[in-house]
């Protein structure tokens, strides 16, 4: 078998290739992989390998029924129209036998089907029904002991450098994971951690369907996902690594994104290549095994892999050792940040290099004595908390932070009856991951090998790894820090809206000429945008800046027992609940609160406007006579304010409700600094998917039709009305952009045009299908409104608005205008009835943000707007002894009380072997060490913790924290110890829930009031007193009362 040298790339169509090696070819994994890439297999991002018939990884699978799946996950899917979000809920542990019975039961079994195409249709049609259960992330291998060919536990690739040089084991990444699937269990769209290779072998059972997107088109999928899920995208630039996003093939086809699909049968391998996005599902009960690996070609991908920045538990591997060992000629340049390299996705990996050969030779010498030696890794089990602070150790250039994730144990019963616990931290390759502990009976201990060296212990986290990677669960998981390098700017498809600076806001005293504002089509450039795509930008072919050395040595993983460095890759989503609302839901309107509806007299009575947000709109209400000059003045003024686009401003209001009226007035009275006279481009804030509400519109064009390649769009101003918009937001084709450009309204000389969806004039208008006009921002935010022509934002369809919405009254303008018109939107918080016009809410400063499909905009009224800094600032206030404060009494009401003493308590933070976490463990509860005398143990040290149930649990120590407790005394003399966050000073504003239950202590006439515990226990329950009206009818005989009671119960049963 020769590695072909080809000048032109093979496999130009990027189709998934299938290989059938002979036994001789099959013996050398790395050599055959290089051969596959020489044929162009890597261009598809996925390839199938059918091993020789005589090769068997395991002779019999009948003895794994007692294998324990410690943390199965139930996959709940929400969404519609080919766009879905997957949530994972952890279930009780079960054995493989129990799981198989469940998978084959009537509820979860595979439906009848004609062929795989028919089954695929049924999968996408029924995806949101009957949430399946997935047995994922079981750390270990079920290969037989003597199998050396393509043994997933020891592939002997360059990724092994991580464990050999740094002593770090990342479970699921460089150790194998087992996965037990059933019909419809899914692994969502993702690439591997650090964009590594992965290998997946289907041991037995029903097939598995795969979808793959060529690496050279990966960026297109990312942009599409950013458009459909803007909220997730703004929260994390690499949100696809959360493995929660499902996009159907029909949607990919409509957007022209190339993809291919293939079915993996039992006994076949699937290999994914660097930066190859893939997804898929199981046809029924099966068992697969997978892990990650690497080649020399991967190193350049690893340098620029886009990492998840919103969680601490994502895998991040320091590339320093790989560059130093396998790219020594580029090492110094790379350390200096000058190693700029363009990734060629078509280039195959070399069969070998001098550096790889030298490394393999050294490795063989070391491994000769223990070539076939594998032992179980010990792990710790323990409950885990949702949030933990990072604690790290420096180990051979690797930073080992405190695992934020939950670990589960794999227990293997050895013949010596010694139980070995394995921790499952983060899953890595092709299967959805779930933190897992599995128990193997004594007769199984001879057949199941656990990956790892004798000196290393495995860690098992509660993270779930998707089918071919990891999935998300509802619990928090151990954290492998994935923070992006500080020196490399992160760029995302959408920028988080900046808050307008008051100095930029201005309101001219008199209407000015539009020519001064629209002189050059009003374009603005954002100066802070990076010109080079960086570490956070993924694998866009072209720029690959090097990472400075300061960050390269930060391979962060959870610390492991006995000084070994071990971690597992984790892909579970943080605790969150699936959306329970419907985009079309209307909430019955009630009287608005005083907080949201100030009593303001009608402007029509020419009374002076007192609200700062409404002052600039005084001449724009539709009940006033049309005033085109006032519209020009308003449009010209807001064109100078960020975001400079009359449509994007939906997500960045000009008015700041938190500011004083004087501040807001000053912003509008500030003079214009200077008029923009040079063309420029900025990134629109409104994602393209907000314009495409239903899948019906998807066929019109791909997203961002009028965007530049870098995601920016030209800002252009109308020569007459001075409104400024992005070309992409307003739908302006490039051939129409010119000096003197006119908006749709000015082209038709519709000087008196007004929006049919609100009560305000001005802004960017487009014509509706019934020949009226509507603000583009109103059409985006009102759920039932559609753009018939999405790219050009024309032919707005307002005919689907229900009567209930048209009857809603705006809390902002109902006292300013006499008529009820337009269509209101409502707060997205629960069933909040607050309603308002889009432009009224925008002018008043109501927070609106892009939401994930199938929702458009997430709206938060003032009542539900949370300021995260309020509570933290309150907790910073010092409380002293003798101070009068307010806190909760035992009777659940709040009273004034006096601080009698302030004490501090040191708590230890430990992670148990099962992955759970405790932040409030007392030092004396650690029985394996006298912490009161010797002090705390070393970070990462294994300890024994005595739990309140009296049992001892294994755990790892991760740090300590100090909590202050306040002993307070109420007027009735009772005392209680409270934390700072439960105490309010007299000068703090009390939350509503506290105000509602705040009381003033009375005399001791009602003693029971101050003994809530007794009341709850029922010891002081008030006796019932018989009414005088029924004294003559009361029978004291208990036998008679029992007879009546039994007779009554019999009568009730007969009626039922």
From Swiss-Prot:
<keyword id="KW-0479">Metal-binding</keyword>
<keyword id="KW-0677">Repeat</keyword>
<dbReference type="Pfam" id="PF13832">
    <property type="entry name" value="zf-HC5HC2H_2"/>
</dbReference>
<feature type="binding site">
    <location>
        <position position="208"/>
    </location>
    <ligand>
        <name>2-oxoglutarate</name>
    </ligand>
</feature>
<feature type="binding site">
    <location>
        <position position="310"/>
    </location>
    <ligand>
        <name>Zn(2+)</name>
    </ligand>
</feature>
<dbReference type="GO" id="GO:0019827">
    <property type="term" value="P:stem cell population maintenance"/>
</dbReference>
<dbReference type="Pfam" id="PF13831">
    <property type="entry name" value="PHD_2"/>
</dbReference>
<dbReference type="GO" id="GO:0001825">
    <property type="term" value="P:blastocyst formation"/>
</dbReference>
<feature type="zinc finger region" description="C2HC pre-PHD-type">
    <location>
        <begin position="752"/>
        <end position="785"/>
    </location>
</feature>
<feature type="domain" description="Tudor 2">
    <location>
        <begin position="935"/>
        <end position="991"/>
    </location>
</feature>
<feature type="domain" description="JmjC">
    <location>
        <begin position="144"/>
        <end position="310"/>
    </location>
</feature>
<keyword id="KW-0223">Dioxygenase</keyword>
<feature type="binding site">
    <location>
        <position position="236"/>
    </location>
    <ligand>
        <name>Zn(2+)</name>
    </ligand>
</feature>
<feature type="compositionally biased region" description="Acidic residues">
    <location>
        <begin position="386"/>
        <end position="397"/>
    </location>
</feature>
<feature type="binding site">
    <location>
        <position position="278"/>
    </location>
    <ligand>
        <name>Fe cation</name>
    </ligand>
</feature>
<dbReference type="GO" id="GO:0010468">
    <property type="term" value="P:regulation of gene expression"/>
</dbReference>
<dbReference type="GO" id="GO:0000785">
    <property type="term" value="C:chromatin"/>
</dbReference>
<feature type="domain" description="JmjN">
    <location>
        <begin position="16"/>
        <end position="58"/>
    </location>
</feature>
<dbReference type="GO" id="GO:0008284">
    <property type="term" value="P:positive regulation of cell population proliferation"/>
</dbReference>
<dbReference type="GO" id="GO:0008270">
    <property type="term" value="F:zinc ion binding"/>
</dbReference>
<dbReference type="InterPro" id="IPR001965">
    <property type="entry name" value="Znf_PHD"/>
</dbReference>
<feature type="region of interest" description="Disordered">
    <location>
        <begin position="423"/>
        <end position="442"/>
    </location>
</feature>
<feature type="binding site">
    <location>
        <position position="243"/>
    </location>
    <ligand>
        <name>2-oxoglutarate</name>
    </ligand>
</feature>
<dbReference type="InterPro" id="IPR034732">
    <property type="entry name" value="EPHD"/>
</dbReference>
<keyword id="KW-0863">Zinc-finger</keyword>
<dbReference type="GO" id="GO:0005721">
    <property type="term" value="C:pericentric heterochromatin"/>
</dbReference>
<dbReference type="GO" id="GO:2000736">
    <property type="term" value="P:regulation of stem cell differentiation"/>
</dbReference>
<feature type="zinc finger region" description="PHD-type 2">
    <location>
        <begin position="808"/>
        <end position="865"/>
    </location>
</feature>
<feature type="domain" description="Tudor 1">
    <location>
        <begin position="877"/>
        <end position="934"/>
    </location>
</feature>
<keyword id="KW-0862">Zinc</keyword>
<dbReference type="GO" id="GO:0006338">
    <property type="term" value="P:chromatin remodeling"/>
</dbReference>
<feature type="compositionally biased region" description="Polar residues">
    <location>
        <begin position="512"/>
        <end position="523"/>
    </location>
</feature>
<dbReference type="InterPro" id="IPR003347">
    <property type="entry name" value="JmjC_dom"/>
</dbReference>
<feature type="binding site">
    <location>
        <position position="192"/>
    </location>
    <ligand>
        <name>Fe cation</name>
    </ligand>
</feature>
<comment type="similarity">
    <text>Belongs to the JHDM3 histone demethylase family.</text>
</comment>
<dbReference type="GO" id="GO:0032452">
    <property type="term" value="F:histone demethylase activity"/>
</dbReference>
<keyword id="KW-0805">Transcription regulation</keyword>
<feature type="binding site">
    <location>
        <position position="242"/>
    </location>
    <ligand>
        <name>Zn(2+)</name>
    </ligand>
</feature>
<keyword id="KW-0156">Chromatin regulator</keyword>
<dbReference type="InterPro" id="IPR019787">
    <property type="entry name" value="Znf_PHD-finger"/>
</dbReference>
<dbReference type="GO" id="GO:0051864">
    <property type="term" value="F:histone H3K36 demethylase activity"/>
</dbReference>
<feature type="binding site">
    <location>
        <position position="200"/>
    </location>
    <ligand>
        <name>2-oxoglutarate</name>
    </ligand>
</feature>
